[in-house]
């Protein structure tokens, strides 16, 4: 496993080149588009557009994943994986900054949908009675 450091205060092009390097080698690159660990249970952190720009530049889909925050370290990790999103399908021509922001918002909305889906599944499971 490889880690690509990102300096949020002084972001530079070398990060894009490293992401491109690994994607060209069919590696999986996980990006948290909030830019930090999300401490909010209600997913109110906005997504940054860097992940969108990288996916467009490298011509790869984004596969949205929602990971439920655990209250305790011993709890089972719960997550849900969405369908791949091909961002190029949502824009025409050269992407503008408004396109990047709008696509980042769309990804955020998708994560909210995945959270709601997982919450519904877990609620149904909790209602079952075991003997």
Segments predicted by a language model, with ranges:
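Catalytic core of membrane glycerolipid acyltransferases/transacylases, capturing the structured
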Residues: 1-11, 18, 72
């Amino acid at each position: 496993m490889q880690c690509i450091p990102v300096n949020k205060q002084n972001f530079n092009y070398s990060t894009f080149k490293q992401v491109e390097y690994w994607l060209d080698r069919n590696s999986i690159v996980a990006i948290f588009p909030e830019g930090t660990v999300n401490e909010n249970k209600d997913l109110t952190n906005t997504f940054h557009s860097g992940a969108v720009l990288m996916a467009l530049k490298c011509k790869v889909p984004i596969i949205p994943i929602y990971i439920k925050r655990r209250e305790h370290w011993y709890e089972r990790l719960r997550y849900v994986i969405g369908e791949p999103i091909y961002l190029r399908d949502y824009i025409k021509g050269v992407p503008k900054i408004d396109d990047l922001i709008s696509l980042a918002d769309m990804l955020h909305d998708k994560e909210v949908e995945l959270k709601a889906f997982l919450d519904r599944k877990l609620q149904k499971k909790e209602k079952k009675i075991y003997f």
